Design a protein with these regions (language model features):
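Active-site neighborhood of glycoside hydrolase catalytic domains
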Residues: 2-93
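Substrate-binding clefts and catalytic carboxylate motifs of secreted carbohydrate-active enzymes
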Residues: 27, 34, 61, 65-71, ...
């Protein structure tokens, strides 16, 4: 398709541009798309034919085109199709495999100390969101009216439906 042809051109360009960078340890196709397709209720949320198309298109891109292009352009560096590449919530039996995200503190409101127990081989995402430093906030908010979690400006900058509640929890 024209879309995949365009993606291939972008892949080649970016792989060649980035493959010599010392910080590129592995290539990753996406962040949490497979996780969402499998575990976030999308199979129930969308009609069966739409959900099946999601998977078909996912496979074509992340299990097909991207790794095929990487084999040609950067064959020695590993590729994972989605991050995390282990099961959600950092199950202990998965901790020695691949890389992991652990949302137990953020989404599950577990105490920070749980991170001493949930120690995967490679954790690429964990922790709790926060607001930016005050100098950054001052670029979009006025101190006299907007420096309140409930102000319209602060709500517009909070992208998580549970964000402010979790921040206040901790």
């Amino acid at each position: 398709s024209a879309f995949l042809k365009n993606v291939h051109s972008e892949l080649v360009y970016n792989i060649r541009r980035l493959r010599q960078h010392p910080s590129v340890a592995t290539w990753c196709g996406n962040n949490e798309i497979r996780e969402a397709l499998k575990y976030w209720g999308w199979a129930k949320r969308y009609p069966k034919e739409v959900y099946e198309k999601f998977w078909h298109d996912y496979e074509a891109l992340f299990a097909g085109l991207i790794p095929e292009t990487l084999r040609e352009e950067d064959p020695l560096r590993p590729y994972i199709e989605s991050s995390p590449d282990t099961v959600n919530w950092g199950r202990p039996q998965e901790m020695g495999l691949g890389e992991s995200h652990y949302w137990g503190v953020w989404y599950g409101r577990q105490p920070f100390e749980i991170l001493r127990e949930r120690m995967p081989r490679f954790m690429s995402e964990f922790g709790v969101e926060s607001f930016p430093m005050l100098p950054s906030i001052s670029r979009f908010a006025r101190p006299e009216t907007d420096y309140d979690l409930e102000s319209d400006v602060m709500k517009a900058h909070q992208k998580s439906s549970i964000g402010n509640d979790v921040i206040l929890h901790y």
